[in-house]
Amino acid sequence: METKRQGMVVWLHSLKQSKALRKFGNVHYISRKMKYAVIYCDMNDLERHMAKLSSLPFVKRVEPSYKPFIKLEYESKLDKAKEYDYKVGF
C-alpha cells in the first residue's frame, strides 16, 4: 500500500542548518543559489511539519506543493491546423 506524499518548499536564511531538515521528511533538492529546499513527507503529517518548520529561526517561509490537487490527465483536442481539409489540386 502506497502512502500519499506531498512536497513542500522551505525557504531558508542560510544553508548551514539544511541537514536539520532531514527529520521532517525526505530532502529531495536543495538550491544553494536561491536558498530553498524541497521536502517530501506524508500528507497526514504535512500541516504539523509546516507549523514546526515555520517556527524554526533559520526558515523564512514554508509553502506546500499543489501537485497532488492538479489534474494531470489531459483531454485530447484536435489541432486546428489538422482540422481543416486543405485541397491542393487543380
UniProtKB/Swiss-Prot annotation:
<comment type="similarity">
    <text>Belongs to the UPF0298 family.</text>
</comment>
<protein>
    <recommendedName>
        <fullName>UPF0298 protein BPUM_1393</fullName>
    </recommendedName>
</protein>
<dbReference type="InterPro" id="IPR016979">
    <property type="entry name" value="DUF2129"/>
</dbReference>
<dbReference type="Pfam" id="PF09902">
    <property type="entry name" value="DUF2129"/>
</dbReference>
<keyword id="KW-0963">Cytoplasm</keyword>
<dbReference type="GO" id="GO:0005737">
    <property type="term" value="C:cytoplasm"/>
</dbReference>
